[in-house]
């Protein structure tokens, strides 16, 4: 499946849990969701990423550095959702990326 097909499939899928299932099978779904979260402040993408990070944190963890970019964008709602994703990823934080952002968390 190419990137355009994946993007269209996400848009056409009404049920978020179906997008979560798709993300578990198709590697391009997570970067597309992160891009939507960062560039469009897409709440649906944020919610799907929260679900994905709860269910399969190892799939989302490689994108940790991209996800934390949302902390400095948009509003408190986006920051709150981003912290939820990060909290879910901490159980698999084998590269200790938390150390880079923990001061930002405690200052919030």
Description of each model-found segment:
Residues 4-25, 44-57, 80-94:
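Structural detector for internal amphipathic alpha-helices that build alpha-solenoid repeat scaffolds
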Residues 38-42, 74-76:
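Short inter-helical turns and helix N-cap capping residues of alpha-solenoid HEAT/ARM repeat scaffolds
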């Amino acid at each position: 499946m190419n990137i355009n097909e994946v993007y269209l499939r996400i848009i056409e899928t009404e049920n978020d849990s179906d997008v979560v299932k798709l993300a578990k099978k198709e590697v391009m779904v997570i970067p597309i969701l992160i891009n939507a979260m960062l560039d469009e402040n897409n709440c649906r993408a944020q919610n799907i990423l929260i679900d994905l990070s709860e269910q399969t944190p190892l799939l989302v963890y490689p994108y940790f550095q991209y996800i934390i970019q949302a902390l400095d964008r948009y509003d408190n709602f986006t920051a709150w959702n981003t912290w939820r994703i990060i909290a879910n990823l901490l159980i698999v934080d084998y590269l200790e990326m938390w150390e880079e952002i923990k001061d930002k968390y405690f200052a919030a």
